[in-house]
Amino acid sequence: MGTARFLRAVLLLSVLLMVTFPALLSAEHHDGRVDICRLPSDSGDCLRFFEMWYFDGTTCTKFVYGGYGGNDNRFPTKKACMKRCAKA
């Protein structure tokens, strides 16, 4: 029974890495810098409730930020998000 649980955990971790890793790679510039506008929304680790904006690849969308952690694709206003991420 313990082996089955371990294998299930390894499989779950493998799937999670296969989904997350390409998204992070696609967010990198050729010089190694990360384009924050290509990062996925990340609500962070805490349980606070802040309405923030992130760029979803097309436009800026509201999401709830927990107040700690997350990534830099997080803006206090739609205007700030569009200014940083919208391509003219």
From Swiss-Prot:
Domain BPTI/Kunitz inhibitor span(s) in chain numbering: 37-85
Entry's Gene Ontology BP terms: envenomation resulting in negative regulation of voltage-gated potassium channel activity in another organism
Pro-peptide region(s): 28-33
Compartment annotation: Secreted
InterPro entries with a match to the protein in the record: Kunitz_BPTI, Kunitz_BPTI_sf, Serpin_venom_toxin
Pfam families: Kunitz_BPTI (PF00014)
Protein name listed in UniProt: Kunitz-type U15-theraphotoxin-Hhn1e
Species assigned in the record: Cyriopagopus hainanus (Chinese bird spider)
Highest classification ranks of the organism: Eukaryota, Metazoa, Ecdysozoa, Arthropoda, Chelicerata
